[in-house]
Amino acid sequence: MTMTRRSALGGLAALALPLPATAAVKGSDTLGGIAAARGIRFGSTLGLRNFEDPAYRALNARECALVVPETEMKWGATRPDARTFDFRAADRIVDWATRNGLGVRGHTLLWHSERWMPDWVKQHDFGSNPRAEAERLLTDHVRTVAGRYAPRVDSFDVVNEAIDSDTGLLRETALSKPIGAEAVIDIAFRTARDAAPRAQLVYNDYMGWRSDEAVHRTAVLKLLEALKKRGTPVDALGVQSHLGSKYSDSPTGLGSLDERAWRTFLDEVTGMGLDLLVTELDVHDNPLPGDIRRRDADVAAHTRAYLDLMLSYPQTKTVMCWGLGDRYSWLNGFRPRADGLPKRPLPFDAALRPKPMRDAIAAAFAAAPVRG
């Protein structure tokens, strides 16, 4: 339904259904079941563009312990204008997940990038007191969305991609111009804590373990340190894990990896008392050979090495793929392969058959230390 803010808040009582006492029991041979045996939650993104596929829904219900709406909780989906909220798409996914005993993550209360903000925000008249109006818009949005879903969402990506990965500087948006990017981030987290006091609050970004991502890693550490120093309620870092995506045209395959620097980064993050989540795992296979058997083997090996490292940290208790089947990957529309072949970035192929990447994820879970 499309609703005003008042009616959106009024609908909270109807949504306040209890979370399942325990997640739906997964078969011991499913990814969700193998992960659960080690104290880890496994899940995937689910969006309306693939939600209508009953076979894909069934795959998610079978393999996953939780799902995250792909775009349906973002500003562009929930806010057609400054006065209106539209939760129809997000409600369908959350309702389905609850009926199937699955947990839900929320993504994202603020995508701090001008490119991904709705046009109406960029064109909004902030009036004679732009600072107050920017704060009102942001607070109203976070409070309404987080408050609506807090009964059934136990982890929110509060702020997503606030940093320019090339410069290391905080991005500027229509909301941050009147009050500053640091204030915007603080307001988002503090409002989320008020609206969802029991939820895990996450800063989510795409810094990675490649040697040419040092600027991004350093900037993320600086941001997290500043948030902790100001007492901003951030609980965890979401590591997107789009492996190979940023520099996928490199002739060096999936890139020069700097495991030592990555471990140093993760040590510093966890040293702040923050948990880790793998939030958007996939592997961009553009630089890999066309031969499917070899390509799948390379993707699987890369995935296994990455997850072994991430899961060596007991603070990593959630692993999410950004999709389960190649048919619906966002990477299909991102930098086509030079040979024109379909990409194979996910654990199941376009026909939803398991691939070596699925086996690699299962093996990484099985080998992971048990979480306390």
How would you describe each model-predicted region?
Residues 20-45:
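C-terminal segment of N-terminal export signals and the immediately downstream linker at the start
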Residues 36-91, 96, 103, 110-123, ...:
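N-terminal substrate-binding region of glycoside hydrolase catalytic domains
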Residues 67, 97, 156, 237, ...:
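Conserved, mostly hydrophobic/aromatic
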